[in-house]
Every structure is written in C-alpha cells, then in structure tokens.
C-alpha cells in the first residue's frame, strides 16, 4: 500500500463515522502549493462555505500559498464564511492527512475565528 492509498483509506474511515453521526464537516485538502477548506452540510451534498489559497483575496494576503501563513488565512476565511451562514459547530475532517503543520495551523485559525470543533 502506497502513501496515497493509505491516506485515502484513513479518510474514508473517518468520513464514514462522521456520516453516521450526521454532523457538519470542515473538510481540508492539502497539496504542496495550495490548501483548500470546505464546510459541508450533514447530508454531504451541499457546500455551505469554502476558502482556498487559489482565491485572489487570500493570495494577496500571503507571500507564498504553500506555507503555514497561507493555511492560517484560509482557516480564518472559512470560519468567518461559515459563521455568516449560521454554522457554529463542525467536525474536523483532515482527509487522512496528519494533524501537523499546515493542517494544524488551519484548524487553530478556524477555532480562533469562532468555529467550534
């Protein structure tokens, strides 16, 4: 089993648990250059809020899009957008990535901006 398939297996197991609980999820995806975050409704078919380093507004705030500063900007932005839609509590879906580095920074920034998880 290679690294990618192991990560996907971990993500599938976590998503199955969250789907059974019926909670709103904060889903992240990480690439070497960008980081993406979405708040997905409990039914799994509706994106309530989203933010990523691909957006022009966030790219203007940071010097480089693949570091912790960029992840913090995305975390803050997605939390503000989710709170504006009335979402206050979410489950953190790290998509099988380790809770370390940019993933942890995004989560901490979202918590500081007011999301609860």
Swiss-Prot record:
NCBIfam families with a match to the protein in the record: L18_bact
Gene responsible for this protein: rplR
Top-rank lineage group of the source organism: Bacteria
This protein's name: Large ribosomal subunit protein uL18
Gene3D superfamilies noted in UniProt: 3.30.420.100
Lineage of the species this protein comes from: Bacteria, Pseudomonadati, Pseudomonadota, Gammaproteobacteria, Pasteurellales
Organism: Haemophilus influenzae (strain ATCC 51907 / DSM 11121 / KW20 / Rd)
An example molecular function term from Gene Ontology annotations: structural constituent of ribosome
Keyword Transit peptide: no
GO BP term (any one): translation
């Amino acid at each position: 089993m290679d690294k990618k398939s192991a990560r996907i297996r971990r993500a599938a197991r976590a998503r199955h648990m969250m789907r059974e609980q019926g909670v709103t999820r904060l889903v992240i995806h990480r690439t070497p250059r960008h980081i993406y975050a979405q708040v997905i409704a409990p039914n799994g078919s509706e994106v309530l809020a989203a933010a990523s380093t691909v957006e022009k507004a966030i790219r203007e705030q940071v010097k480089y899009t693949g570091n912790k500063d960029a992840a913090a900007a995305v975390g803050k932005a997605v939390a503000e957008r989710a709170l504006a839609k009335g979402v206050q509590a979410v489950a953190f879906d790290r998509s099988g990535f380790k809770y370390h580095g940019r993933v942890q920074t995004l989560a901490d920034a979202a918590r500081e901006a007011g999301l609860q998880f």
